[in-house]
Amino acid sequence: MNIAPPLAITTDADLGPLNTFGLPARAARLLRVRGEEDVRALLAEPGWRGEPRLVLGGGSNLVLRGDFAGTVLKVEIAGRRLVGVREDADGAAWIVEAGAGECWHDFVRWTLAQGWPGLENLSLIPGTVGAAPIQNIGAYGVELTERFDALDAIDLDSGETRSFDRTTCAFGYRDSVFKRAAGRWLVLRVRFRLPQAWAPVGRYADVAAELAARGIAAPGAADISDAVIAIRRRKLPDPAKIGNAGSFFKNPVVDAAAWARLAAAHPEAPHYPQRDGSIKLAAGWLIEQAGWKGRNLGPVGCYERQALVLVNRGGACGEDVARLAAAIQADVEARFGIRLEPEPVFV
């Protein structure tokens, strides 16, 4: 396929540095998308329509099982701005927009520096702004959906640019319409609603303990952000040093009957009642009870400080990760009758 300048296109591109697991893989073509015009130029190419495509953000939610025989679109769209202040039934809020290629953590810290709290519990989550709604991230008592306003995305099939609100994003637990239609949509920019009537969310046990240890009884948003950063750095490996994709499995959500069966044998199991009557379980606890915490299988392993994180001990490939994930799933299911679902996308 002939692509004319100014597109930043690379052939036989190395994807190793572009995924936080550090898995070896190459792409037939890599396009660095720095604006909507780059996507439109690519869509105008006659050979584009029929080939495989992969939209890539920070590569922190990805397991590459081998080379990719198509075009990888590496989203690097920058920009941050205050759109304005909106008054609605929920009160006044700052509407803040960021380009999809912005580093998520840097964006969070920037909003706090501007005096716009609301995203502090989501500090230090790896990845980009554009990937955050795709994965529907959440941590330490706050879900992205609580702060999400809208996003703009381009349909790679039709070339149409469309805006999505909470309803049309069809958010689910660590899920969205974009994740279910992988390769179709490229997120361009995301807008967030940050309430001016801010209140801290510090009820999560780890956050409360960290704040107490710091002697902070009335935390501000920056205090919560600092606490979350400290917790994550203690518990989770730095991808720059140890390859990983963060939390590898979703916390399973079961019905009351399934929880009753588990509680009869393991009343100590961590559990979190949901509004709809279901029960969210701690995948890390299930994995640890199955004996996997700190164990290795070939060049990959289960992190010794957090069983929910799978790590590349050095020289691993995507199939090694898939093999370990399957072994953990099988053991947890055999012991508890619960099937764990991976968070990362396998390609």
Curated annotation (Swiss-Prot):
Gene3D superfamilies: 3.30.465.10, UDP-N-acetylenolpyruvoylglucosamine reductase, C-terminal domain (3.90.78.10), Uridine Diphospho-n-acetylenolpyruvylglucosamine Reductase, domain 2 (3.30.43.10). The keyword Glycoprotein does not apply. Keywords: Cell cycle, Cell division, Cell shape, Cell wall biogenesis/degradation, Cytoplasm, FAD, Flavoprotein, NADP, Oxidoreductase, Peptidoglycan synthesis. InterPro entries: FAD-bd_PCMH, FAD-bd_PCMH-like_sf, FAD-bd_PCMH_sub1, FAD-bd_PCMH_sub2, MurB, MurB_C, MurB_C_sf, Oxid_FAD_bind_N. It is found in: Cytoplasm. It comes from the Bacteria. GO terms for cellular component: cytosol. The keyword Cell division applies. GO terms for biological process: cell division; cell wall organization; peptidoglycan biosynthetic process; regulation of cell shape. It catalyses: UDP-N-acetyl-alpha-D-muramate + NADP(+) = UDP-N-acetyl-3-O-(1-carboxyvinyl)-alpha-D-glucosamine + NADPH + H(+). The active site is at R174, S247 (proton donor), E343. SUPFAM superfamilies: FAD-binding/transporter-associated domain-like (SSF56176), Uridine diphospho-N-Acetylenolpyruvylglucosamine reductase, MurB, C-terminal domain (SSF56194). Residues 23-197 form the FAD-binding PCMH-type domain. One of its GO terms (molecular function) is UDP-N-acetylmuramate dehydrogenase activity. Its main location: cytoplasm. Its cofactor is FAD. Pathway: Cell wall biogenesis; peptidoglycan biosynthesis. Its EC number is 1.3.1.98. Cell wall formation. Belongs to the MurB family. NCBIfam families: murB, PRK00046.1, PRK13903.1. This is UDP-N-acetylenolpyruvoylglucosamine reductase. The gene is murB.
